[in-house]
A protein has these predicted regions:
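Class I S-adenosyl-L-methionine-dependent methyltransferase catalytic core
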Residues: 1-146, 152-198
Length: 198
């Protein structure tokens, strides 16, 4: 039987090679964090992969939806990064198949300037508040979330905070280890079993 979840909430690689460290130093005012190099975002997922993922869920929220071929949507989620004038994007878009109007979330995330300082462990990590906002837009009857591009587990943490079960998949072992550490800091109650095994 095929695994199914109520909601797909993910931030797939866009194929922009951010993992190569090409944007390590955009300014001389601060030293950018070195995340190492990898090839996980050299290519975006195929159209087939996205269709298959969408088939596994009733509701979908896909960050970077503007980079992919997806059906028309009346509900885009817009994350306004409150950046000011610089060479980073002013906002990020999430495509959805939700039945509501476009929604905007204002949350500063600009290098050292962050609305709520959060340790960044992944080059394309979304703030927890942004994932919580996105998940709050899903229908209230959502009880399970799938994130097949989990990174360091931000979607899983947002689901936990909302009392929603979640499944995360990540191909990079180091990010899985980081996600385990983050999740151990937010321990789930498994009926007396509180250890998360890596």
């Amino acid at each position: 039987e095929t695994l199914r979840c109520d909601c797909l909430l993910c931030d797939p690689p866009y194929g922009l090679s951010e993992a190569k460290g090409k944007n390590k130093s955009r300014t001389k005012l601060a030293v950018a964090k070195d995340y190492g190099t990898s090839d996980w975002d050299d290519e975006p997922p195929s159209d087939f992969d996205l269709i298959r993922l969408r088939d596994l869920t009733k509701w979908q929220i896909i960050f970077g939806g503007n980079y992919f071929v997806l059906p028309p949507s009346k509900c885009w989620l817009v994350w306004d990064k409150v950046n000011g004038a610089n060479d980073f994007a002013d906002c990020e878009l999430a495509w959805t198949n939700l039945d509501k109007a476009v929604r905007i979330f204002h949350y500063m995330w600009n290098g050292m300037l962050k609305e709520n300082p959060e340790y960044r462990m992944h080059p394309t990590q979304k703030p927890l508040a942004v994932c919580k906002f996105a998940l709050s837009m899903a229908p209230k009857d959502v009880t399970s979330v799938l994130d097949p591009y989990m990174g360091v587990g931000t979607t899983i943490l947002a689901a936990k905070a909302a009392g929603i079960s979640a499944i995360g998949v990540e191909r990079e072992e180091r990010y899985c280890a980081d996600a385990v550490v983050r999740l151990q800091q937010e321990v789930f109650d498994f009926g007396g079993v509180n250890d998360i095994q890596s």
